[in-house]
Each structure stands twice: as C-alpha cells, then as structure tokens.
Amino acid sequence: MALKELLVQLDETDEAVLRLQLAVDLALSHASRLTALFVDEWNIAQIDQRPSPELSDGSHTASRILRDDLERFHTERGLEFEWHYMREFAGPAVRQAALYADLCILCDQGSSNCADVDRAFCSDIAVNVGTPILFIPKSTRLSSVGRRIVIAWDSSRAATRALTDAIPLIEESDHTIILNVDTGTHAQSTAGLQRLTERLSRHGTHAEYLQIERVDGRSIGNLLQTRATSLGADLMVAGAYGHARVTEKLFGGVTRDLLEKMQIPLLVSH
C-alpha cells in the first residue's frame, strides 16, 4: 500500500517542531498529502474551568508558528497539506482524524500533565485505531526516520500485520534488520527468518536477520530496545497486542514495554 495520506499530531510542546519536520520529510518522500492536527488539549484540572488566557495564548502562538512552517514547506518544497486546529482531548481527536490516514505520526504520550493519562494514550491509540501508528518519542533527536529499520519479529499475526504495513517505509530504507528474541519456547527457525529476509530484499532494502538470546531475566521489550539502539536503528516496527476493553490487562508484556519505554521511533499495528 502506498502512503498517500499522512496525519501528524501537533501541540504546543517543543518536540512538535521535530515531529513536524520528520512528518514533512516522510510526506515529501512518498508524495503524500500531510494533514496537520494541532490539538490544544484540555488539562484534567481544567475540565470544569475556563482555560486561562495564558494557556490559550501559548497554544495559539505555537499553532501559528507551526502553521507558518507548513506554509514555508509548501512554498519551498511543494508540500501538499491540510491544517486542523482542535480544542479537545488528544485521544478522541486523533482517533477521528486517523480514519482518513494511511499512517499516523504521533507523540509517544498525550499532552496531559497527568502520568496515568500519558501512559494510557499510547495503548488506547494502538488498540483502537486501525491505521498504522508511528510514535515519535519525546526524547528523540533523530534527523530522519526509516533509513535503518529493525523489525521485532515473532511470527505472530500482529508482527506480520505491522511488517506488511511498514512495507512502504521498508522500500525507502537503506537497511532492514529482522530482530528475533529466542525465548526457548517459541524459537523461530533459521529457514523461516531467511525466507522473510528474502521477502524484504525484494522490496529493495538490504535485509538481514539477527537472533538474540533472552538472558538475565530481562524483558523482551527491553532487549529489543537495547539491541535496536546499539544497531543504530532509527525506526522499530512491532505488532501491538491487546483488546480495547481489557487493554490494561493485556498490555503487560512486550507491547507495553515498547510503548512505555520508547527510545527510538516505533511503528505499531493492531
């Protein structure tokens, strides 16, 4: 599937500037239209209050600067874009806008100052949005996404879905590494990993696979993150496991670790 409609979530944080730059680069690389959704999010403490002028002024200033950046990208680089400003909670706003996108580019947390809301944002979006989600960690300082990709692979339906959704990005990458953690109980065959490598190579990327052992009781999510970082990856692709009604119970394993402790951009599908 070609990526022709991209959605990027923006807000008044400093990280939104880099998120927009990465989204613009992806849109231009794939000849896509970019929809910029600026969410001026309600704070939990303000639900029963009118927003302060200071907060509104800050959000409006940030949105104006980002809108001006988009206009500049349109003039200088030919970017096709749409702009939407919403005073809303991030979750509902993103879920609605995602209905019309091929890929959503989001921050790794909601804009709320409430830690529980931040943690719930990623899992809620990953489970309830059928569109592939590219989370950009607030801590990232990468200047590009998708040149060197790591695929978190366990032969599951979720991993297969995520890999397939990432094909347009894989086709533009320089190097793709299939990373498999050998847990001893569901070991992946070398032949299967080699076959998958051949599949990806047909999409024009330099592909290889790497198996790592689970040692010292470390979580699989931690192992994947650590190895991906050491390999110089600028994107990890992983399946999202869970069910909308019992997200908190089922996001207790690899998916939760990847979502809550993101070190590099993460593409997930459910």
Give the residues covered by each predicted segment:
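A short, aliphatic-rich alpha-helical micro-motif
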Residues: 98-99, 126, 170, 230, ...
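A short acidic, glycine-rich active-site loop
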Residues: 53-65
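Short, flexible loop segments at boundaries between secondary-structure elements
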Residues: 143, 260-270
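Structural beta-alpha unit
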Residues: 1, 72-104, 203-236, 240-247, ...
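Generic structural signal for helix capping and beta-alpha/helix-loop junctions
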Residues: 44, 91, 113-115, 143, ...
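Glycine-rich, Arg-bearing micro-motifs that act as flexible, cationic patches
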Residues: 106-124, 146, 238-260
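Hydrophobic alpha-helical segments and helix pairs
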Residues: 81-141
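Small/aliphatic-rich secondary-structure junction motif
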Residues: 1-53, 128-131, 145-212, 233
